[in-house]
Amino acid sequence: TLGYIECLIDYLTDLRDADVNEITKDVWKIEKLDIQVKQDLIRPRKTISFTGISQPELKEEIKKAVYFQLRIESLETVKKELTAIRRFSRYLNEHKKNVKSCADFDRTIIEEYLVYMKTEDTGTKRYRSEITRLRSILNIVADIYQYPQAKDLILNRDIPPNIRSEFKVYSDAELKRFNEFLAKVDIQTARVMTIHQMLGTRISDTLTLRTDCLMEQNGEILIRIYQMKTHYYEKPISQELAALIREAIRYTEERYGKCKYIFTNENDHTKPMTYSLIQGRITTAIYRENLRDDNGKYF
């Protein structure tokens, strides 16, 4: 598309002016890149690693593709593409030692790799996602380096249909036990989990709620929820949930002053609480309180 071409031209211009020392390294420090990297605030990353790509020429091609991708995609998406290319690189190193660059790729190599992925224990449980990500980054390399022979080598028919995941459903007794358990963790962690349940959102959406998220409109209380990829949306909430959110805001402001996020990072008040912190607190408490589901397994 025209937008993609314009982005590619801008990328090549930025690449010319970039910090050459950083983008030639095998491990990039995100803070040293001269572009704004979009990433999940509750799962922050500090580096991007290209180690594990065995072929030097391929590694350099992938670096340029990643530098381009970081302009338009989230860091999490790019890291998943890197996982796919590292796995492909290992296969090439073991079975196609003469292949050094994307310029050497052809349909036969891809077909043989797809068979290998289906028949060998490659360590991935998400075949469809892996192939989709591999296609994405290989096509970008083909565009940047003008390798027409390497473009669209992975076909639509190579990618199996998406299979919907089954969500775990908790019984009323399990939910009752879990909610009783929340009374035994620290108050702000309990509020995170309760608000998360009542909103019915992803945990990342709850952890990035802002202190100005509540508003009134036509007699209703609305909450504004920010998402990394879709900016924000608003939805009505109950008086009870609004009261709980206000308590969480008051707790934060009494301890840390005015903050951007309700559940602020205690070490950096410009950022939200991290997912790993919440996960660690809840997991520790689950084992301490011996909290189990109806089948006797830990929650």
Segments (PLM) and residue ranges:
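A cross-kingdom feature marking solvent-exposed beta-strand/loop segments within repeated
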Residues: 1, 94-126, 156-165, 176-180, ...
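Basic, alpha-helical nucleic-acid-contacting "clamp/cap" segments
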Residues: 131, 135-145, 217, 226-272, ...
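Short helix-capping and inter-helix turn/linker motifs at the boundaries of alpha-helical repeat units
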Residues: 56-57, 104, 168-169, 182-186, ...
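Charge-rich, intrinsically disordered N-terminal extensions
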Residues: 1-154, 181-184, 194-195
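Short, charged phosphate-coordinating catalytic segments
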Residues: 145, 195-217
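Basic, Lys/Arg- and aromatic-enriched nucleic-acid-binding interface segment
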Residues: 173-203, 293-294, 298
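Short, basic/aromatic-rich helical patch in the C-terminal catalytic core of site-specific tyrosine
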Residues: 134, 206, 299
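Active-site-adjacent "gating/activation" loops or surface patches in catalytic cores
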Residues: 150-175, 256-259, 269-298
